[in-house]
C-alpha cells in the first residue's frame, strides 16, 4: 500500500547549517586521523592505483546522475509544500535515475571487461562498478529539497566513522589496496544509498517515489539534458587532471597520481565543508530567484559568503606556509614531493567558493544552463590544454597550475556575464584581508624564526594566529563572528 504523502517539518537555516558544518568537520577530521596510516601502509604507488580507479569510475557515475541532481533539487524544492505534486516529480526523477544508472553500469562493465589496458587491475575496477549504483540511486536530492540536513549529516558522520574503523582493521601492507578499494566503494556511495533509500521508505522525506507515479518522466529529459551537459563540462573542468597525470606523466604514473591526490585531499576536504555549508541556502535560493526577490538573493549570498571567507582565509594561509610540514605529518616522507602542489591547490579554494555560489548555483537558479555549459566547456578545454602542456613540463606541479589558471578564467567569465560580482566581493571582505595579513605575518615569524619540530610549529602558529584572527575580526565587527557571539550570549541568558 502506498504511504500517504505528508508535509515535512523543516529546521531553521542556522540549525541546518550547524548539522552540515558538523558533518563536514567530521569529514575533515577523519582524513587527518586515517590517511597518515593509509598512505604509510599502502605507499604512493598502491594508493595511486585506487585513486585512479576512483577517478575513472567517477565519470561513469557522472553518467548515471547526468544533470539529475541539480534538476531534482530545483524542481523538488519548488514543489516541497505540495506533497502530492512532489511525489509525482520525485517518481519521474527516480525512474530516470534507474534508467541512467543501468546504462552507465553496463557501459562501465563493457570497458573494464573488453579493454586490454584494464586487465592488470580488473578486479579493482570491477569492485568500483558498485560505485555507479550507489551514486546513481542514492536519492540524496530528495533530502536536500526537503532540507533534511540533520539526517544527511548523521549519515555522513556514520559513514566516515565506519570508513575509519574498517581502514584501521583491514589494511596491513601495500598489497591491501584491493581491500582499500572495497572500503572506499562501500563507505563512499553504497552505504549512502542504503541509508537514504531505507529512510525514504520509512517516511523521512514525507513521500516515497514509485514507478507507479513515474508516467510523463520524458518531460524531465529536455531540462535535464542541458543540466547534463553542464555536469559534463563541470567534471572535465574540475577533475580531469588526475587522469591526465596518469596518461602523460613522464615519471611513474601510479606514484605521480598518488602524490598529487595526497596534496589535494586537504583543500578538497575544506571545499567539501564550505560547499556543504553553502548548500543550506540552495532550496531558498532557487525559490527567491524564481520569485524575483533580488534583495533576498543578495542577503543569502552575502551572509553565506561571509561564513565561507571566515573559514577559508586562515585555512588557505595554513596550507601555503606549512605545506611541507603538513604533507610530512599527513602522508609521510614518501609524499614530500607533493608539498608545492598543496600550496598551489590551496589557492583554488577561493575559486571553488566563488564559482559555486555566484556562478554555478546562480546560473542554475536563473535557468541559464546553456550559458553556463558554454562557459564550463571553455574552462574544460582550457584546463585540458593547460594540463597537457604543463604536466609535460612540470609534472604534478604543472597539473595544479593548470587547474588554478582554468579556475581563475572561468570565475572571471561567469561573474562578469551575469553581473554577480556584488554577491561575493563586498566591502565586508576587506575585513578578512586585514585579518589574513595579521595571520600571514604570525605564520612567517613562527616558520622562519623558530626551530620547532613540524607538529609543534603548526600547533603554535595556528594557536597564536587564531587568537589574533578572532581579535581583529571582533574589532572590525565581522558579521559571522558577531552572530556567533550573540548566539552564545543568548544561550547563557537562557541558562
Predicted regions and their residues:
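Membrane-proximal transmembrane or re-entrant/amphipathic helices at the cytosolic face
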Residues: 2-4, 444-495
Amino acid at each position: 500500500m502506498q504511504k500517504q504523502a505528508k508535509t515535512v517539518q523543516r529546521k531553521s537555516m542556522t540549525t541546518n547549517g550547524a548539522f552540515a558544518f558538523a558533518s563536514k568537520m567530521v569529514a575533515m577530521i577523519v582524513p587527518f586521523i586515517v590517511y597518515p596510516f593509509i598512505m604509510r601502509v599502502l605507499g604512493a604507488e598502491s594508493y595511486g592505483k585506487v585513486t585512479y580507479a576512483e577517478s575513472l569510475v567517477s565519470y561513469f557515475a557522472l553518467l548515471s546522475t547526468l544533470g539529475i541532481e541539480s534538476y531534482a533539487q530545483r524542481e523538488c524544492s519548488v514543489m516541497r509544500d505540495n506533497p502530492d505534486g512532489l511525489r509525482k516529480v520525485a517518481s519521474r526523477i527516480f525512474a530516470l535515475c534507474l534508467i541512467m544508472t543501468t546504462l552507465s553500469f553496463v557501459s562501465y562493465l563493457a570497458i573494464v571487461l573488453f579493454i586490454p589496458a584494464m586487465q592488470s587491475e580488473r578486479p579493482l575496477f570491477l569492485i568500483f562498478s558498485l560505485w555507479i549504483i550507489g551514486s546513481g540511486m542514492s536519492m540524496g536530492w530528495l533530502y536536500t529539497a526537503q532540507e533534511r540536513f540533520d539526517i544527511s549529516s548523521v549519515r555522513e558522520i556514520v559513514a566516515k566513522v565506519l570508513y575509519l574503523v574498517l581502514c584501521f582493521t583491514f589494511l596491513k601492507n601495500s598489497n591491501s589496496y584491493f581491500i582499500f578499494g572495497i572500503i572506499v566503494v562501500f563507505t563512499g556511495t553504497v552505504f549512502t544509498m542504503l541509508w537514504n533509500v531505507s529512510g525514504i521508505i520509512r517516511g523521512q522525506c514525507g513521500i516515497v517515489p514509485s514507478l507507479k507515479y513515474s508516467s510523463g518522466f520524458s518531460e524531465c529529459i529536455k531540462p535535464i539534458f542541458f543540466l547534463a551537459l553542464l555536469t559534463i563540462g563541470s567534471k572535465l573542468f574540475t577533475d580531469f587532471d588526475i587522469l591526465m597525470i596518469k596518461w602523460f606523466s613522464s615519471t611513474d604514473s601510479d606514484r605521480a597520481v598518488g602524490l598529487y591526490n595526497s596534496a589535494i585531499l586537504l583543500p578538497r576536504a575544506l571545499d567539501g565543508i564550505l560547499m556543504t555549508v553553502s548548500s543550506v541556502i540552495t532550496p531558498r535560493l532557487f525559490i527567491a530567484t524564481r520569485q524575483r526577490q533580488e534583495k533576498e538573493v543578495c542577503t543569502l549570498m552575502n551572509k553565506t559568503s561571509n561564513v565561507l571567507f571566515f573559514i577559508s582565509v586562515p585555512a588557505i594561509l595554513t596550507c601555503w606556509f606549512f605545506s611541507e610540514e603538513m604533507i610530512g605529518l599527513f602522508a609521510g616522507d614518501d609524499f614530500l614531493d607533493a608539498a608545492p602542489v598543496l600550496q598551489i591547490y590551496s589557492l583554488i579554494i577561493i575559486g571553488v567558493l566563488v564559482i559555486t555560489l555566484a556562478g554555478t548555483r546562480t546560473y542554475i537558479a536563473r535557468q541559464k544552463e546553456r550559458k553556463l555549459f558554454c562557459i564550463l566547456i571553455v574552462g574544460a578545454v582550457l584546463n585540458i590544454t593547460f594540463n597537457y602542456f604543463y604536466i609535460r613540463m612540470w609534472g604534478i606541479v604543472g597539473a595544479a597550475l593548470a587547474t588554478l589558471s582554468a579556475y581563475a578564467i572561468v570565475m572571471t567569465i561567469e561573474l562578469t556575464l551575469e553581473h554577480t560580482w556584488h554577491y561575493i566581493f563586498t566591502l565586508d571582505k576587506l575585513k578578512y584581508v586585514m585579518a589574513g595579513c595579521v595571520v600571514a605575518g604570525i605564520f612567517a615569524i613562527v616558520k622562519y624564526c623558530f626551530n620547532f619540530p613540524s607538529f609543534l610549529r603548526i600547533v603554535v602558529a595556528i594557536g597564536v594566529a587564531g587568537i589574533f584572527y578572532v581579535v581583529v575580526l571582533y574589532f572590525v565587527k565581522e558579521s559571522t563572528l558577531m552572530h556567533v557571539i550573540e548566539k552564545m550570549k543568548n544561550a547563557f541568558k537562557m541558562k
